[in-house]
């Protein structure tokens, strides 16, 4: 489904299905990566939903936080150099723990929320400029798994077996159909490029189809607030019986819940079940990693105010709260910082206090000036990268933040626990 009204001028409503004929028009400029869309449309997405380009260096920084936690050391895949990085070319060495082998790394389940074109999963191009990134320098979570498979297999059959498992462990969802299509294409093209890079041949049709089927399950369309297919409902007819006949029929509309695949157990499961501890007699599936740059806000009014603006509400906090429920490992999200740190904004006081006192909270990286990260204007209260570790063995008393970094020393701030916020200026 389109899942957006952006294509109404082309004759496609949000509830319309994206047909094969439309997909054939991908090259005809019907569906485009965000970098190729008009500046007006980009600004509209930013204004309505707080949707912004996530530069590749930020994706790399967040992905590095995840891998630092997994490996127990820094700079495993690359070294960050400001807004660039230098790829490490030596063979990746794994810890001696049985739970930290290269095969365990491949099977680690990793989800990008509100994935857009999936820049955290695969980095075929710089999302801000559209410039291609050479294969060996890519920084996505799937890119990293492919590198590990390349370094630990010696024949194409074993390689393909573990590439399949790598794809089965990478997930992403988005509400907009055009984003889902582009994300799927990026993952599929990454497989083709990986085969060419490692084995100097193109994959067979059957090899491509098998990967494509996995992608069609693992990159899916979903409304994050209902965990259901956007714009779709089915009718439920309720019939009340009296002594002689049925009467009082009523019809209600119910959303269609989304399902995903648990490949290791070879079964589909409702997304809702991820929130449970147990499901159908077994431990419910949880993600080992959740990462992303969720939407920050949504418009709540159709009419503009006198100053030409529309009322909006914060929504980024809901993505953090839901991620906390379905992850058993690392969560690294980026969203506006000042409004929750200083409890400004409806519904953010409770969220801010709970967040800052969460014993799973490990690190905050704060940029007071959002333009240090994003080129789009409109985020006035700074940007925070928030890292939590939901592993039950990682809890620490007090929920004290280990790092609170700013690129503007004159506006340095830090927070401490105990249910209140304290700003420390120029320390």
Please place each PLM-identified region on the residue numbering.
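SAM-dependent methyltransferase catalytic region
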Residues: 1-365, 369-373, 385, 389-402
């Amino acid at each position: 489904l389109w899942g957006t009204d952006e294509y109404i001028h082309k004759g496609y409503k949000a509830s319309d299905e994206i047909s094969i004929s439309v997909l054939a028009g991908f090259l005809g400029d019907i569906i485009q990566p965000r970098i190729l869309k008009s500046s007006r449309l980009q600004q509209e997405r930013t204004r309505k939903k707080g949707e912004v380009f996530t530069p590749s260096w930020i994706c790399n920084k967040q992905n590095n936080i995840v891998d630092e936690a997994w490996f127990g050391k820094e700079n495993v895949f690359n070294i960050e150099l400001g807004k660039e990085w230098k790829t490490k070319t030596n063979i990746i060495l794994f810890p001696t723990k049985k739970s930290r082998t290269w095969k365990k790394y491949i099977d680690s389940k990793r989800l990008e929320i509100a994935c857009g074109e999936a820049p955290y999963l695969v980095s075929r191009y710089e999302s801000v400029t559209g410039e291609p990134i050479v294969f060996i320098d890519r920084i996505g979570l799937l890119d990293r798994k492919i590198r590990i498979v390349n370094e630990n297999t010696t024949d194409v059959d074993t390689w393909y077996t573990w590439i399949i498992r790598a794809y089965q462990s990478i997930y992403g969802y988005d509400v907009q159909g055009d984003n889902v299509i582009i994300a799927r294409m990026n993952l599929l093209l990454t497989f083709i490029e990986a085969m060419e890079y490692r084995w100097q041949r193109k994959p067979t049709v059957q090899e491509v189809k098998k990967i494509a089927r996995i992608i069609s399950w693992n990159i899916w369309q979903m409304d994050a607030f209902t965990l259901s297919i956007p714009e779709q409902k089915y009718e439920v007819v309720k019939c009340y019986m009296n002594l002689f006949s049925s009467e009082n029929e009523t019809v209600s509309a119910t959303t269609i819940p989304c399902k995903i695949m648990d490949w290791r157990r070879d079964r589909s499961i409702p997304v809702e079940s991820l929130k449970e501890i147990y499901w159908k007699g077994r431990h419910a599936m949880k993600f080992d990693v959740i990462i992303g740059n969720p939407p920050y806000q949504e418009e709540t009014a159709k009419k503009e105010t006198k100053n030409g603006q529309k009322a909006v509400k914060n929504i980024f906090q809901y993505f953090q709260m839901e991620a906390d429920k379905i992850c058993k490992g690392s969560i690294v999200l980026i969203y506006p910082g000042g409004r929750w740190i200083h409890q400004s904004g409806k519904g953010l006081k409770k969220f801010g206090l709970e967040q800052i006192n969460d014993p799973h909270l490990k690190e905050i990286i704060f940029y007071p000036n959002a333009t240090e990260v994003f080129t789009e204007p409109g985020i006035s209260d700074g940007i925070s990268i928030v890292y939590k570790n939901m592993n039950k063995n990682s809890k620490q008393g007090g929920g004290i933040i280990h790092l609170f970094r700013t690129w503007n020393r004159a506006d340095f701030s830090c927070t401490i626990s105990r249910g209140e916020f304290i700003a420390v200026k120029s320390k």
